[in-house]
Amino acid sequence: MNIQALLSEKVSQALTAAGAPADSEAQVRQSAKAQFGDYQANGVMAVAKKLGMPPRQLAEKVVQLLALEGIAEKTEIAGPGFINIFLDKQWVASQVENALNAPKLGLTPVEPQTIVIDYSAPNVAKEMHVGHLRSTIIGDAAARTLEFLGHNIIRANHVGDWGTQFGMLIAYLEKMQNESANEMDLSDLEAFYREAKKHYDEDADFAERARGYVVKLQGGDEYCRQMWRKLVDITMTQNQINYERLNVTLTKQDVMGESLYNSMLPNIVADLKAKGLAVESEGATVVFLDEYKNKEGEPMGVIIQKKDGGYLYTTTDIACAKYRYETLNADRVLYYIDSRQHQHLMQAWTIVRKAGYVPDSVSLEHHMFGMMLGKDGKPFKTRAGGTIKLSELLDEAYGRALKLIAEKNPQMESDELAALAKVVSIGAIKYADLSKSRTTDYVFDWDNMLAFEGNTAPYMQYAYTRVASIFKRAGIQEDTLTQPITLNDEREFALATRLLQFEETITSVAREGTPHVMCSYLYDLAGLFSGFYEHCPILNAENDDVRQSRLRLALLTAKTLKQGLDTLGIETVDKM
């Protein structure tokens, strides 16, 4: 049930009946304060201005024509023409019943789209580091959310698996295998990469061999392809361990690296030339874009092929967008890439649109994000200024969570403690990021993220166990609750109304790619449940009808918290 959508439709109908143009916006919003009702329609002022009519007069006309019988208890006009809508308690109670009994908490079924989500994108022969964290967990939350709504999701892990560095990596892998009879496991990819680079810089014969391998690899040489595949496989096997630890849904089957588009690049350059979009300039092939100007105010040149015949990231990104539309049949493509890549992506997509590779009906969206900073406000690094490996960050989170939980639960068995620390530590890292607006930089702070108070994963996980434990404690099965829901106390009504706003929240998250909106909703919901729990006795209610009604409200709260956290990729536990 999407109350906002329902009320928007009703207010729009009343506006049209009152003489407003058919496309007039109702601007229905959740009210910030209870005295202004549960929802507010703010669109009257703008429409009245268009009609040359006093806003209050139009508001009165709209209220008379509003068909909200059985939905709203009353409507009031406030100020110059705001319409405050107070929902009917019985109607809200009946909608809560529906949400409890329907699949997916009563969400309105969507028209399924094929949505490609580009996220994570680590590099081959390098270990994942904290810089990969935001794309990985924000992108995964988007994938889970849209999948839950009923869309067909294609996860695309745009791995950096191509480039001139592979000549040096293949040459070094060959050297290592010749020197060691054991099969390489590349347990420390960073050290492997550093050693390969050192040999390349210091050994002329090695460098010559490496350059030769680049040419052979690009020409499809079978030996080089085999060595290259080995490097990709070793890297992605190691990355998969990180994904599984993070409770991220990416698998090896989702790898769609840069190399996937290699065969398309010559044809794209030829086609852009044929269409008059690309021209030769100083030996390179360039697309000049009027939409972007250089310092002299002239159209900016975007190189798609270098003098030496090599291609650039832009060329690959053009091919990638074309492939996602033509081959994957995408209706919508979301890119979870940091904000520094914005202009690069916009230029690639401008070329894509001009060339007719992807129609305007297919949405290409850059869901950019800011940086992860340390407490000093600088990019998050080790004390020595080095990059923090993702696996080391996860190890530290686990160690901290284990210590914290052991202090709070000295009697807990060690295996139970370990399982709980795993769930809490991963939840804490993910929620700390997801609860901040993705477009801003955020400060990584261990103490805040592992706190059991405030808008944190441990607090949210505890809030869920608190609700779930009511049923456990009393030995109640949900199918034994048959009495209807009644909302006589204002706290019952506030909780019920907020529960029904789950669909509005998840719809907004799906549209904008903003998981922090879900985090805020869940935190607010947990707070409302806390107030309800303290002031409205559940198991000790005055009679069985009230007891069952409150238990059913608690049940929907538990289901909503669990489902909401699941869309973020955060697990819940039954005991904390």
Swiss-Prot record:
Membrane-crossing residue ranges in chain numbering: none
EC assignment: 6.1.1.19
Gene3D superfamilies: Arginyl tRNA synthetase N-terminal domain, HUPs, Isoleucyl-tRNA Synthetase, Domain 1
InterPro entries, per database record: aa-tRNA-synth_I_CS, Arg-tRNA-ligase, Arg-tRNA-synth_N, Arg-tRNA-synth_N_sf, ArgRS_core, DALR_anticod-bd, Rossmann-like_a/b/a_fold, tRNAsynth_Ia_anticodon-bd
Gene Ontology terms, MF aspect: arginine-tRNA ligase activity; ATP binding
Coiled coil: none
Subunit structure: Monomer.
Family: Belongs to the class-I aminoacyl-tRNA synthetase family.
Protein name as annotated: Arginine--tRNA ligase
Lineage: Bacteria, Pseudomonadati, Pseudomonadota, Gammaproteobacteria, Enterobacterales
